[in-house]
């Protein structure tokens, strides 16, 4: 149980790619959602505001039908306006405490996640500000962010022991190394490429779910 009062579970945290083709994004995401990941994050760093809104709105409808919470990356105003299930904040996205207040004011059960990179003090501050999960990364070399600094696996276990929040790992995670991430202490493996670029995204997402149970 986290600040939002929700159990975020253990397994896959699917994160959408920077996909300009909305039809293709929806088709792939539908297949991922069929495997019931713990969360889906809408992330598109290169889309216009209008396209982000259109894609997020349509993804929210898919998530509602699948019973999977939708988290909006970086954009609290969009998350609140659409009634999404939560927002994910990076270091440049504003105050986590202010986001927590706004989410709580919008209704019960809203989820706040914060990127902590490889920075333990940021995780402590995020948890104190009301984050439901803290995300560390890049755990491995990432095709999405090839220049990202690496975060040690040991942070996952420390967060699991010392913070009363869900622990997520991101960055270069594949089926080949996800077992190490869960064993180190992560509750959630946040994955973009290895799921959305798979020949069968549903089967790949299901494989993560099964792996998290081992």
Task: Name every feature range the model reports, one short phrase each.
Residues 143-147:
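Short, glycine/charged-rich beta-strand-loop motifs at protein surfaces that mediate ligand recognition
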Residues 188-191:
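C-terminal binding/interaction regions
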Residues 1-96, 101-132, 148-151, 158-167, ...:
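Conserved N-terminal beta1-alpha1 strand-loop-helix module at the mouth
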């Amino acid at each position: 149980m986290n600040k939002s009062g929700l159990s975020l579970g253990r397994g896959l945290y699917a994160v959408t790619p920077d996909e300009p083709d909305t039809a293709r994004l929806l088709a792939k995401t539908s297949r991922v959602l069929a495997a019931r990941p713990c969360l889906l994050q809408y992330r598109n760093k290169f889309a216009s505001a209008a396209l982000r809104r259109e894609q997020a709105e349509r993804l929210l409808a898919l998530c509602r039908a699948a019973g999977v919470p939708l988290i909006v990356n970086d954009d609290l105003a969009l998350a609140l306006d659409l009634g999404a299930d939560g927002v994910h904040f990076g270091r440049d996205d504003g105050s986590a405490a202010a986001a927590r207040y706004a989410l709580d004011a919008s209704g019960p059960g809203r989820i706040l996640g914060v990127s902590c990179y490889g920075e333990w003090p940021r995780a402590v501050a995020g948890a104190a500000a009301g984050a439901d999960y803290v995300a560390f990364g890049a755990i491995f070399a990432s095709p999405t962010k090839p220049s990202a600094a690496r975060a040690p696996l040991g942070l996952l276990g420390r967060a699991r022991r010392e913070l009363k929040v869900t622990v997520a790992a991101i960055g270069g995670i594949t089926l080949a190394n996800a077992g190490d991430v869960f064993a180190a202490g992560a509750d959630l493996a946040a994955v973009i490429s290895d799921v959305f670029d798979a020949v069968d995204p549903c089967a790949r997402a299901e494989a993560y779910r099964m792996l998290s149970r081992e």
